[in-house]
Amino acid sequence: MRVAVTGTPGTGKTSATEAFERGVADAFVGDGVDEVDDSEVIHLNDHVGTDRLYTGVDESRESLVADLDGIEAWLDERENAEDRKEAETLLVESHLAHLLPADRVVVLRCHPEELTRRLSERGVEKSKASENAESEALDTVLSEAVSRHGTESVYEVDTIDRTPTEVGEAIAAVVAGERAPSAGTVSYLEYFE
């Protein structure tokens, strides 16, 4: 099974999936849930540059333009590699993960004001942080995920007032099938008022 963990930059994808990797999944082992215990996490953004999974450079954003077809082929090849550990579940973490084939899609959400604060702490330019906050308020990633995968495969997780471990536990519940799909449960439209 392939699970996409996605969201606007700053929502906590990397922190939550790192918590998942550190052992959040172990809490589910006693329940006999092999999919959670036997998972592999791919931090996709780490591979876009190193594995040349891009088509060019966007000079205005100072970022690589991801090659989604190339990434899809790379993931398929990686899943089918003979020397790869046999994992029941492949978690793909990236702000682009929802644009790729997946059985389940976890969309992490964060209030735009908190998102702006997090991105500012990272040193992201104010204009870029504002752009991401507006994207979050408009449900951009959620809308794209639902459009591509349908509401029955999308699980929205609000990261406000949750630690990375708690968000990792929510991801583990999705992987284990212990959480119902929940697209459209979070709204930040008041951000524009």
Residues covered by each model-derived region:
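Conserved phosphate-donor/acceptor-positioning beta-strand/loop module used by diverse small-molecule
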Residues: 102-125, 132
